[in-house]
Swiss-Prot record:
Belongs to the ABC transporter superfamily. The ATP-binding domain (NBD) and the transmembrane domain (TMD) are fused. ATP binds at G371, R372, S373, G374, A375, G376, K377, S378. Residues 336-572 form the ABC transporter domain. Pfam families: ABC_membrane, ABC_tran. Part of an ABC transporter complex. Transmembrane domains (TMD) form a pore in the inner membrane and the ATP-binding domain (NBD) is responsible for energy generation. This is Putative export ATP-binding/permease protein RT0691. One of its GO terms (molecular function) is ATP hydrolysis activity. Homodimer. One of its GO terms (cellular component) is plasma membrane. Residues 20-303 form the ABC transmembrane type-1 domain. It comes from Rickettsia typhi (strain ATCC VR-144 / Wilmington). It is a multi-pass membrane protein.
Length: 576
């Protein structure tokens, strides 16, 4: 096992010193009770049964009962406190991992699968609990029992104890031989399990599409393929574990048989008493079971340590942070400017999405953005939100370079509504106040009326306090978009970004809602990406983007007269 990993785990353990002291006292009490029983057995046979001394027999039985009580009580405290510590630590680790993950740069999520994240935060962290319990409880207990058992065996018979010691290297050879192989298999098994979780997450997030295309059988087949891959690694690992366990059992019991054989000869010759040989066999069994337990734990330790390693990579991953951020000015008016901005995604380094883009948007403007798919419209918004950093050029808000401003401060000024409305599995109200949890009931009710949520929420049993299911499954696409827009408006942003945010609404509803938005956002900036030209006809001006550049700009009327590319976009919509 990697010592660095143990040291890392020990940093968490230091917060639970009192609990761990109780665990250690309990462990020693359990070990001492079991070891003392062997000594009592010897007295029972040699002084009680051999001498027909019923008083000695009764005393020995009483001592055994007392030791069993101590053993039981100590076992309870050991089990309770170590498992309690393990749960507290894994929850602390889970919180740290979650907190770090949720603060990653957006582009870092492109390298991760949601299923892998879920697997690490659940399965991997549960494995860490197993590591804590096994190491701090069973490993230490078995180590104490092994050392104590061997020591007491030497007190009983040096010759027989020497035979037992010889068997230890025999057990170490296969452990070392199989150890590296098991570690590799454990890593592959965890990765394979992550793929399973990803598949489950993807399947049930897209269950309607699967039903619509009758792909249930195909998905079952795909899942079975991944399941079989996971099972292959598990089977190999279990075979190695079973083989090692079989070797351990064989060596342990052959050793005990040899001890009985030689011990019987010593009894006949008068070198050992019957009580001594029984006591020795008892200690040999204790030592054998303890060593078997240790080897069993060591053969299985690679799975939880690999899981710990995977979690530590999440906790230790540091996103790029600049300490020399400036505060974002908060004047009465707001402005946006792009100066010669270039951008490419890390996943597509050879494809320039934004190409030397320049534009300026002043306060009190409603700006529409159009362009063909892949032109860079949504990327423009994501750069403004600081989801990504531009490769070249400068992006300014209020004449300040946003690369020098904390992204959190930037986003306080902005509200963003994507085409696919992000809805949480909570109530309508909770989803709305996600934009501003300090809003008054009056403000919430006004936004609900303005966005038309009242029209459908009043028909629900609990109104805006109705639970709407995972991802708003109980709502229509248009209803979800209204909630997302209400959330954005409640934020009282200086800049409102709409990325096809009303695509699920009919034209009349869209115009009504848009007029309401324009009133609320008066004096500020609205940027609306649209595939439906009708939604931006009333814009102050429209930016036409092609191949990552603003190729032309103007009102709908001017562009319809003077821009061929704009007319083509309009014609393409009419043919859809």
């Amino acid at each position: 096992m990697d010592i660095k990993l143990l040291y890392r785990l020990a940093k968490y353990l230091r917060f639970y010193k009192k609990d761990l002291i109780i665990v250690m006292i309990s462990l020693l009490s359990v070990s001492a009770s079991l070891l003392l029983i062997g000594s009592v057995f010897r007295n029972l046979i040699d002084k009680g049964l051999a001498e027909d001394n019923i008083l000695s027999v009764n005393k020995s039985i009483l001592y055994i009962c007392l030791l069993i009580v101590i053993l039981s009580v100590a076992s309870f405290f050991r089990s309770y406190f170590i498992n309690n510590v393990a749960e507290k630590i894994v929850n602390q680790i889970r919180k740290e991992a979650y907190s770090n993950l949720i603060n990653y740069e957006i582009e870092e999520y492109e390298e991760l699968k949601i299923g892998d994240i879920i697997s690490r935060l659940t399965n991997d962290i549960d494995q860490i609990a197993t590591l804590i319990v096994n190491f701090l409880s069973f490993f230490i207990r078995n180590s104490v029992m092994l050392i104590g058992g061997i020591t007491l065996m030497f007190f009983e018979s040096f010759k027989l104890a020497s035979i037992v010691i010889v068997t230890i290297p025999i057990l170490l050879v296969p452990l070392i031989k199989f150890g590296k192989h098991v570690k590799s298999l454990s890593k592959k098994a965890l990765e394979s399990k992550s793929l399973l979780v990803s598949d489950i997450d993807e399947t049930f997030n897209n269950i309607r599409v699967i039903y619509a295309f009758n792909h249930q059988i195909n998905k079952i087949s795909d899942f079975d393929t991944k399941l079989q891959s996971y099972l292959i690694y598990c089977k190999i690992r279990l075979k190695i574990r079973a083989l090692f366990f079989a070797i351990s059992i064989a060596v342990i019991f052959l050793t005990i048989t040899l001890i009985v054989w030689i011990g019987a000869s010593d009894i006949v010759q008068g070198d050992l008493s019957a009580g001594q040989i029984i006591s020795f066999i008892y200690y040999a069994i204790i030592a054998g079971v303890s060593s078997g337990g240790i080897f069993e734990l060591l053969s299985e330790i690679h799975l939880p340590t690999t899981a710990l390693e995977r979690i530590i990579t999440i906790i230790d991953k540091i996103s790029i942070v600049h300490n020399n951020y400036y505060a974002l000015n908060n004047p009465d008016t707001v402005s946006i400017e792009f100066k010669n901005v270039d951008f490419t995604y890390n996943s597509r380094p050879n494809l320039k999405i934004i190409n030397n883009m320049s534009l300026k948007i002043n306060a009190n403007k409603f700006v529409g953005i159009v362009g063909r798919s892949g032109a860079g419209k949504s990327t423009l918004i994501q750069l403004l939100l600081r989801f990504y950093r531009q490769d070249n050029g400068t992006i300014l808000i209020n004449n300040q370079d946003i690369s020098r401003i904390n992204p959190t401060d930037i986003r306080k000024f902005i509200a963003y509504v994507p085409q696919e409305a992000s809805i949480f599995s909570d109530t309508i109200k909770s989803n709305i106040i996600f934009g501003n949890n300090k809003a008054s009931d009056y403000e919430i009710n006004e936004i609900i009326k303005i966005t038309g949520i009242e029209e459908f929420s009043n028909k629900l049993h609990d109104g805006i306090n109705t639970k709407i299911g995972e991802k708003g499954v109980r709502l229509s696409g248009g209803q979800k978009q209204r909630i997302a827009i209400a959330r954005a408006l409640l934020r009282k942003p200086k800049i409102l970004l709409l990325d096809e945010a009303m695509s699920a609404l009919d034209t009349m509803s869209e115009q009504k809602l848009l007029n309401a938005i324009k009133k609320i956002m008066k004096g500020n900036i609205i940027i609306s990406i649209a595939h439906r030209i009708s939604s931006i006809e009333s814009a102050d001006y429209i930016l036409v983007i092609d191949k990552g550049k603003v190729v032309t700009a103007g009102s709908h009327y001017d562009l319809s007269k003077n821009s061929e590319i704009y007319r083509n976009i309009c014609r393409e919509q009419l043919t859809i």
